[in-house]
Curated annotation (Swiss-Prot):
GO terms for biological process: fusion of virus membrane with host endosome membrane; symbiont entry into host cell; virion attachment to host cell. The lineage of its organism: Viruses, Riboviria, Orthornavirae, Negarnaviricota, Polyploviricotina. Glycans are attached at N122. It comes from Puumala virus (strain Berkel). The keyword Phosphoprotein applies. This is Envelope glycoprotein. One of its GO terms (cellular component) is host cell surface. Disulfide bonds join C1-C10, C18-C27, C58-C62, C164-C194, C187-C239, C204-C209, C240-C245. It holds the Pfam family Hanta_Gc_N. Keywords: Disulfide bond, Fusion of virus membrane with host endosomal membrane, Fusion of virus membrane with host membrane, Glycoprotein, Host endoplasmic reticulum, Host Golgi apparatus, Host membrane, Host-virus interaction, Membrane, Phosphoprotein, Repeat, Viral attachment to host cell, Viral penetration into host cytoplasm, Virion, Virus entry into host cell. Belongs to the hantavirus envelope glycoprotein family.
Length: 275
């Protein structure tokens, strides 16, 4: 979303796509990611435990020992070719047997033995459906390059001036202070003097700020959630906008009382922080 003076517009921009208005053009270019369209993602347990990225997962001409060599498919079991040769082995007064000269280690066993050499990824808040898998990447390994082109006829003097008035109240807080767990600060934000306002709401104490989120405010009351990390046992976290903060702040819990994975992580982890 962009807001220039009274002009405001939003668009979901994909790779190599642009948001174009009369005054500005914003393009998403050169998206860098650890994932490629042809990659295969392998989960060895629950989705929350993450998975491995395979660049060369066999699908058609599989040899025994390749990743994905023996797989169940909608048309039956996929059986790989054997990379080797058979020869007859005979001994006196016994039935001849066939001896295989080649690889006898399956792709799964070979993968398990060398899984640390594959690139891995973490998964947070997964959502799976019949046709898609969505999750949040806690590693922040995705890098998007944004190119902004501004028209020459744009009046920069008026961009910082807005009639919008914002009042803030700190409603509640979840999580803990410190850098291990993180907290979720819930703010009640009142907007007057204009119908919509795109701006940033921050979570701060008297010393500094620990997190922010972009909010598209509407006239009246708005509820804004801010995720942050930091602070200490005496920090009173307040909701702030620009240089204005709520009149009161709230104290978060101690880190050893909350899970180390954070308030918004998987609840199945029972690891606790000692503070």
């Amino acid at each position: 979303c962009i807001q220039l003076g009274t002009e405001q517009t939003c668009k979901s921009v994909d790779s190599n796509d642009c948001l174009v208005t009369t005054s500005v053009k914003v393009c998403l270019i050169g998206t860098v990611s650890k994932f490629q369209p042809s990659d295969t993602l392998l989960f060895l347990g629950p989705l929350e435990q993450g998975g491995l990225i395979f660049k060369q997962w066999c699908t058609t001409t599989c040899q025994f020992g390749d990743p994905g060599d023996i797989m169940s498919t909608p048309v039956g079991m996929k059986c790989p070719e054997l990379s080797g040769s058979f020869r007859k082995k005979c001994a006196f007064a016994t039935t001849p047997v066939c001896q295989f000269d080649g690889n006898t280690i399956s792709g799964y066993k070979r993968m398990i033995a060398t899984k640390d050499s594959f690139q891995s990824f973490n998964v947070t808040e997964p959502h799976i459906s019949a046709s898609s898998l969505e999750w949040i990447d806690p590693d922040s390994s995705l890098r998007d390059h944004i190119n902004v082109i501004v028209g020459r006829d744009l009046s920069f003097q008026d961009l910082s001036e807005t009639p919008c008035q914002v009042d803030l109240t700190t409603t509640s807080i979840d999580g803990a202070w410190g850098s291990g767990v993180g907290f979720n600060l819930i703010c009640s934000v009142s907007l007057t003097e204009c119908s919509t306002f795109l701006t940033s709401i921050k979570a701060c104490d008297s010393a500094m700020c620990y997190g922010s989120t972009t909010a598209n405010l509407l006239r009246g009351q708005n509820t804004v959630h801010i995720v942050g990390k930091g602070g200490h046992s005496g920090s009173k976290f307040m909701c702030c906008h620009d240089t204005k903060c709520s009149s009161t702040g709230l104290i978060a819990a101690a880190p050893h009382l909350d899970r180390v994975t954070g308030y918004n992580q998987a609840d199945s982890d029972k690891i606790f922080d000692d503070g």
